[in-house]
UniProtKB/Swiss-Prot annotation:
UniProt protein name: Probable diaminopimelate decarboxylase, chloroplastic
HAMAP family assigned: LysA
Keywords: Amino-acid biosynthesis, Chloroplast, Decarboxylase, Lyase, Lysine biosynthesis, Plastid, Pyridoxal phosphate, Transit peptide
Binding site for substrate: 348, 384, 388, 416, 444
Transit peptide limits: 1-44
Modified residues annotated as N6-(pyridoxal phosphate)lysine in this record: 130
Organism from which the protein derives: Oryza sativa subsp. japonica
Known EC number: 4.1.1.20
Function field: Specifically catalyzes the decarboxylation of meso-diaminopimelate (meso-DAP) to L-lysine.
GO cellular component annotations of the record: chloroplast
Gene3D superfamilies, per the entry: Alanine racemase, Lyase, Ornithine Decarboxylase, Chain A, domain 1
Binding, pyridoxal 5'-phosphate: 309, 345-348, 444
Length: 490
């Protein structure tokens, strides 16, 4: 069988114990990066002694103001680049694989696309911290003018540590604890009311903190976002928000607690990976009708929060997907007609395409019916494919031009049949030690990582504006894990 033959040839390099025999492997001494104490040095774009092909130019903002789709691009030399830096070189410089590699300029470009789209509107861009909670990423977004959307007390603490303006932060969630709500009240962030007991807890927290809390009502508009059921949040079966049949009860209750809370707006969130902006328009139309109804009862509403959820091109098919400008233009007139401040909560569309998950191939095998590429990354570091059946584009960092192409499942070392990063992917057969990346890994990947099988969370790096690489999170170590057991009684 042809596939079996090419797999046999692919496994031959495994017999050579000398890793330097792989022509694409970069000597760690040849590349430098930010060290543990924060010093930064540039990474050379190419370490070849031959005259290299020029790397692709770093992605720039499109003429119409839309952010470019991808910052990771294949060069004429066959290597994968991030903003002009070879990913192969980043692998040689990293403390270990797997790791996450970001483009800092792409984060800026993505935010700029939202900022430009919101021109002419009063607005708050509230970054969904749950998508990616790296402190350096948060600090960058705060510097750009982002607020923060939070769903736990620790996310609130992290946002405050990152320097976010509390008056541009929103505390969401269907199970907020009293302790976390007291912190929210003391901090001065907006708080969304999600249920009857949530309202009671918010009032109690306001009294404990001695602060009047600005609140929004999270109304479930029962709009089908046409996405995976696990990421749909605005339909009638969702655990989030209040049903419109109960709206009057909440309004009456809020009036009775006027010394403790102030109703300042309404909120909805439809789901995630949404690729049709008319869904946002339909929801916004329902929400402004609620605004009219609530204002008619004497409430002075200022804010309309339409949530987030804009999808991205995970399949890398160059499909025409809605942009931030498309999204905002569908609701612009509705917002202006009611003189509202618009709050949006992007997460995935701000951060997903800025990052890839970089792995090293452990080996290639076949069980007679399936071909497998086994890598050192796994569902522990990136669970979306296992959890949602999600597709993320996968490619080799520096494939050999002579490698035969076959269909593979890309799997990790975790002791679960569900441990896969991709299935049925046509790829050149890689050598042992080759680099393999999972694209669009900036959102809901590292933030959902676990220590299952005692796989420790990986390091993170980003490419700076000047082409240098900086470590933005160190990898967890076994010693870090053991510290949880220090000084415990026998």
């Amino acid at each position: 069988m042809a596939a079996a033959n090419l797999l046999s040839r692919a496994l031959l390099p495994a017999l050579n114990p000398n890793p330097s025999s792989h022509s694409n492997r970069v000597s760690p001494s040849a590349v430098s990066l930010r060290c543990r104490h924060g010093l930064t040095a540039s990474v050379r774009a190419s370490l070849s002694t031959a005259a290299p092909s020029p790397p692709p130019r770093p992605a720039a903002a499109a003429a119409d103001g839309r952010a470019p789709k991808r910052c990771f691009r294949r060069g004429a030399d066959g290597h994968l680049y991030c903003e002009g830096v070879r990913v192969e070189d980043a692998m040689g410089a990293a403390e270990r694989t797997p790791f996450y590699l970001y483009s800092k300029p792409q984060v800026v470009r993505n935010f700029t696309a939202y900022r430009d789209a919101l021109e002419g509107l009063r607005s708050i861009v509230g970054y969904a911290v749950k998508a990616n909670n790296n402190l350096r990423v948060l600090q960058l977004l705060r510097e750009l003018g982002c607020g923060a959307v939070l769903v736990s007390g620790n996310e609130l603490r992290l946002a405050l540590r990152a320097g976010f303006d509390p008056t541009r932060c929103i505390f969401n969630g269907n199970g907020k604890t009293l302790e976390d709500l007291v912190l929210a009240a003391e901090s001065g962030v907006f708080v969304n009311i999600d249920s009857e007991f949530d309202l009671e807890n918010i009032v109690t927290a306001a009294r404990v903190a001695g602060k009047k809390v600005p609140v929004l009502l999270r109304i479930n508009p029962d709009v089908d976002p046409q996405v995976h059921p696990y990421v749909a949040t605005g339909n009638k079966t969702s655990k989030f928000g209040i049903r419109n049949e109960k709206l009057q009860w909440f309004l009456d209750s809020i009036k009775s607690y006027s010394n403790d809370i102030t109703l300042v707006g309404v909120h909805c969130h439809l789901g995630s990976t949404i690729t049709k902006v008319d869904i946002f328009r339909d929801a916004a139309g329902l929400m402004v009708n609620y605004v009219d109804e609530i204002r008619a009862q004497g409430f002075e509403l200022e804010y309309l929060n339409i949530g987030g959820g804009l999808g991205i091109d995970y399949h890398h098919t160059d499909a025409v997907l809605p942009t931030p400008m498309d999204l905002i233009n569908t609701v612009r007139e509705l917002v202006l007609s009611r003189d509202l401040t618009l709050i949006i909560e992007p997460g995935r569309s701000l951060i997903a395409n800025t990052c890839c998950f970089v792995n090293r191939v452990t080996g290639v095998k076949s069980n007679g019916t399936k071909n497998f590429i086994v890598v050192d990354g796994s569902m522990a570091e990136l669970i979306r494919p296992s959890l949602y059946g999600a597709y993320q584009h996968i490619e080799l960092v520096s494939p050999s031009p002579d490698a035969e192409v076959a269909t593979f499942d890309i799997v990790g070392p975790v002791c679960e049949s569900a441990d896969f990063l991709g299935k049925d992917r046509e790829l050149p057969t890689p050598d042992k030690g080759a680099g393999l990346v999972v694209h669009d890994a900036g959102a809901y990947c590292m933030s959902m990582a676990s220590t299952y099988n005692l796989k420790l969370r990986p390091p993170e790096y980003w490419v700076e504006d000047d082409g240098s690489i900086a470590k933005i999170r160190r990898g967890e170590s076994f010693d870090d894990y053991m510290k949880f057991f220090d000084n415990l009684s026998a």
